[in-house]
From Swiss-Prot:
Enzyme Commission number(s) from the entry: 2.5.1.19
InterPro entries: Enolpyruvate_Tfrase_dom, Enolpyruvate_Tfrase_sf, EPSP_synthase, EPSP_synthase_CS, RNA3'P_cycl/enolpyr_Trfase_a/b
Protein species of origin: Streptococcus thermophilus (strain ATCC BAA-491 / LMD-9)
GO biological process, any: aromatic amino acid family biosynthetic process
Family matches, as PANTHER family: AROM/DEHYDROQUINATE SYNTHASE, PENTAFUNCTIONAL AROM POLYPEPTIDE
Catalytic activity: 3-phosphoshikimate + phosphoenolpyruvate = 5-O-(1-carboxyvinyl)-3-phosphoshikimate + phosphate
Annotated binding of phosphoenolpyruvate, by residue: 20, 92, 120, 168, 343, 385
Protein's UniProt name: 3-phosphoshikimate 1-carboxyvinyltransferase
Protein's pathway: Metabolic intermediate biosynthesis; chorismate biosynthesis; chorismate from D-erythrose 4-phosphate and phosphoenolpyruvate: step 6/7
Protein family (similarity comment): Belongs to the EPSP synthase family.
CDD domains membership: EPSP_synthase (cd01556)
Enzyme class: transferase
């Protein structure tokens, strides 16, 4: 796919598609609650559609009229053994969290995914689930998908210190703990996104969170709710960076989720000197309007406890750093290696091919800016965030063409990305 280059400016306002993390969890909690849950502004990207189909395969009736999704919840006890293998597509969120849901189910399941998902290690979930009494096996000693699993109606509670900062692993263990006999304690390495904890309380459940320690009792039931999904800050991130680095730009993003565990990119932009403003802040919905405009930027250091708050935004932050004066150092981000691709290597290769100066490290990157970018051929390797990062980078290219291979990966999280880009180019 040939990408748009030589942008003269991006102007206009956008309403960002629904948050992917919250969309997944809305389907899960709606399915596990009693009654009919309605979800508005859900993201209809491929990952979320995978989760929706899996719960249908587990016996849940889910209606989608294109406006509102209605989930006829069955509770933990109402899930049925699937007739076929469960297809998780490209979605690490789906396979990890649903492993936790199925941990307390006394039936056989097999979960599989696409080529990319089949390379992602699941041992960080399977090891603690085995301790709780689940029979589960995968491929190689890292338990790559497909996973075969048989849950237990007498799950043991667990005391578990997470070896990595991972909201997916934490959430999988929370779903399992909700079905265990007694109280479980989960201790995070670093604070990660807390949508699962928030939604437990929204759906009438209980848990205690003190610092990095989560206590949760089994045997809880949930009640159906009305959910409105805010815009996804991980999708908004591409426009935040575009508005900062493309000359003559001003972009207004409406209804963006600003959950405090997800706003690391806003902190980084401020640290780099970017012009960014939040308005219309809704403390209940945790959303705001965010405005950015073309800025002179300086390099910065990114590491430590901010990393889980921007882990998915690091590819586009790397592009931002190529357009800042001086060095930017990203560290403590080894988790990038086990995303849809090895994002440290793939991001560096893609942007270096376009003229950037990026040195990959064991746990991050060293980026030296400011560098002009030129045309190149870039492959997403099936990673949606690489695709969108490259499309924004292409806007800065003055010399040559940018040819993006496997651009369809973007549909994983942002099916309307290119139409939104067109709107801003002609805004």
């Amino acid at each position: 796919m040939k990408l748009e280059t030589k942008a003269q400016g991006l102007r206009g306002s956008l309403r960002i598609p629904g948050d992917k993390s919250i969309s997944h969890r809305s389907i899960m909690f709606g399915s596990l609650a009693k009654g009919v849950t309605t979800v508005r502004d859900i993201l209809r990207g491929e990952d979320v559609l995978s989760t929706m189909q899996v719960f249908r395969d587990l016996g849940v009736t889910i209606e989608d009229d294109g406006d509102v999704v209605r989930i006829h919840g069955v509770g933990f006890d109402g899930l049925k053994a699937p007739q076929n293998k469960l297809d998780m597509g490209n979605s690490g969120t789906s396979i990890r969290l649903i492993s936790g849901v199925l941990a307390g189910q006394d039936f056989d399941v097999e979960m599989f995914g696409d080529d990319s998902l089949s390379k992602r290690p699941m041992d960080r979930v399977t090891i603690p689930l085995r301790q709780m009494g689940v029979e589960v096996s995968g491929q190689t000693d890292r338990d790559l998908p497909p996973l075969k699993m048989h849950g237990s109606k007498s799950l043991k509670p667990i005391y578990y210190e997470l070896p990595v900062a991972s909201a997916q692993v934490k959430s999988a263990l929370i779903f399992a703990a909700l079905q265990a006999d007694g109280e479980s304690v989960i201790i995070e390495k670093e604070k990660t996104r807390n949508h699962t904890e928030d939604m437990i309380q929204q759906f009438g459940g209980q848990l205690q969170v003190e610092g990095k320690e989560i206590r949760i009792s089994g045997g809880q039931t949930f009640t159906a709710q009305e959910v409105v999904v805010p815009g996804d800050i991980s999708s908004a991130a591409f426009w935040l960076v575009a508005g900062l680095v493309v000359p003559n730009s001003k972009i207004v993003l409406k209804n963006v989720g600003i959950n405090e565990t997800r706003t690391g990119i806003i902190d980084v932009i401020k640290n780099m000197g970017g012009k960014i403003k939040l308005s219309d802040i809704d403390q209940v919905a945790k959303s705001a309007t965010i405005t950015v405009e073309t800025s002179e930027l300086n390099g910065t250091e990114i590491g430590g406890d901010i990393i889980p708050r921007l882990i998915d935004e690091l590819p586009i932050i790397t592009l931002l750093a190529t357009q800042a004066q001086g060095k930017t150092v990203i560290r403590d981000a080894e988790e990038l290696k086990v995303k849809e691709t090895d994002r440290i290597q793939v991001v560096a290769d893609a942007l270096n091919a376009m003229g950037a100066d990026i040195v990959p490290t064991e746990d991050g990157m060293i980026i030296t800016g400011k560098t002009p970018l030129h045309g190149a051929e870039v492959n997403t390797f099936g990673d949606h965030r690489i695709g969108m990062m490259t499309a924004i980078a292409a806007l800065l290219v003055q010399d040559g063409e940018v040819d993006l291979q496997r651009a369809e990966a973007i549909n994983t999280s942002y099916p309307s990305f290119f139409s939104d880009l067109e709107g801003l180019l002609h805004g």
